[in-house]
């Protein structure tokens, strides 16, 4: 989003076409940017459909993000002399190994990309193991350049005060971007938390919207008192779980929380975005599967802004330790925020690299 907003500002007379591959992505894009952009679903990576798509839109430049390597799209753009850039590029060890299995397909695609801007040196190194290019640069991670609305802090303070019990603020754990089976572990941990902190509140936000109903049933089966964000149900004194079954509200829900557990990490998925809660100064917890964000997680662990947990028991113990020791909680959140702030600046670097092709 930071890159899109900057392109809109810097090139007000250019037409910006943004593609997505899912209805969720489409909905978020339209909600946040509306008529400032045009939206289309990206065609499948088959030449017939791609040529039709490119004939219709006739783009001057193609900007791909992170891991979006579409061999046919890239190769066709090369033949059409459409400048192609892969920005905020990342490549985990697992993805690199998978790409090497199809090197005859992936290597030419990477070689045909005009500009590659990797997030970190480790990403650059993995790209070089696939294709020997001397012109790959690193810019950091664009997600560090996200801005948190200034009014969010005041709004969240008011809501947390409304949720207080007997004048005491409730300790709030958010479990965000959870995947299948992780909710079971989180709920197990939260029941242990309630023994020592009976007024604690859990905000549970599944990663995929198609699982919202399933997760709601899991919470109901656990016997915990539940309200649903999508139904605009109020959090009352006896509420134990708020289900975040809406789209585009994760930053808002983070702002209401004290500690964040970020999912996709207790299972072998590689983790999810740690930067959104770090940007709000939350103490962080994650499972051990962090390969998708290894550079960021390594920094957070080193600064003691992220605790790696491996079970429901460890999750409950760490949360209790943090909320019962306000100084430790504050220090951990500040450490996470420091990592976030010191890594900002990728947006300006990327814009500088894109200036020439955008003005050509």
For each predicted feature, which ranges?
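Catalytic binding pocket for nucleotide-activated donors in carbohydrate/polymer assembly enzymes
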Residues: 113, 250, 255-339
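Structural motif
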Residues: 60-61, 172, 259
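Conserved catalytic-core segment of nucleotide-activated headgroup transferases in glycan assembly
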Residues: 1-12, 154-231
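Nucleotide-activated donor-binding/catalytic signature segment of Leloir-type glycosyltransferases, i.e.
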Residues: 33-39, 216-244
């Amino acid at each position: 989003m930071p890159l899109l907003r900057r392109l809109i500002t810097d090139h007000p007379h250019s037409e910006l076409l943004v593609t997505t591959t899912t209805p969720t992505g489409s909905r978020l894009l339209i909600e946040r940017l509306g008529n400032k952009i045009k939206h289309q679903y990206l065609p499948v990576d088959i030449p017939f459909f791609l040529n039709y798509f490119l004939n219709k839109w006739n783009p001057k430049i193609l900007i791909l993000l992170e891991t979006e390597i579409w061999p046919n799209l890239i190769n066709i753009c090369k033949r059409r002399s459409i400048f192609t850039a892969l920005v905020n590029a990342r490549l985990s060890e697992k993805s690199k190994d998978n790409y090497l299995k199809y090197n005859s397909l992936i290597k030419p695609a990477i070689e045909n990309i005009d500009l590659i801007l990797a997030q970190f040196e480790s990403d650059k190194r993995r790209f070089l193991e696939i294709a020997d290019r001397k012109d790959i640069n690193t810019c950091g991670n664009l997600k560090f350049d996200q801005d948190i609305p200034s009014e969010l802090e005041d709004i969240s303070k008011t809501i947390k005060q409304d949720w207080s019990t007997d004048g005491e603020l409730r300790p709030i754990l958010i479990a965000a971007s959870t995947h299948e089976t992780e909710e079971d572990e989180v709920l197990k941990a939260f029941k242990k938390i309630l023994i020592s902190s009976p007024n604690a509140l859990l905000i549970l936000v599944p990663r995929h919207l198609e699982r919202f109903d399933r997760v709601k049933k899991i919470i109901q089966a656990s016997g915990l008192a539940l309200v649903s964000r999508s139904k605009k149900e109020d959090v009352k004194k006896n509420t134990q779980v708020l289900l975040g079954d809406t789209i585009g509200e994760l930053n808002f829900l983070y702002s209401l929380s004290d500690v964040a557990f970020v999912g996709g990490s207790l299972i072998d998925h590689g983790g999810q975005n740690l930067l959104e809660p770090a940007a709000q100064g939350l103490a962080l917890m994650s499972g051990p599967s962090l390969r998708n964000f290894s550079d960021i997680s390594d920094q957070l662990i080193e600064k003691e802004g992220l605790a790696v947990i491996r079970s429901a028991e460890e999750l409950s113990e760490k949360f209790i330790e943090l909320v019962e020791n306000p100084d430790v909680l504050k220090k951990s959140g500040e450490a996470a925020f420091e990592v976030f702030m010191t890594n900002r600046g990728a947006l300006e670097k990327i814009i500088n690299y894109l200036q020439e092709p955008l003005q050509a």
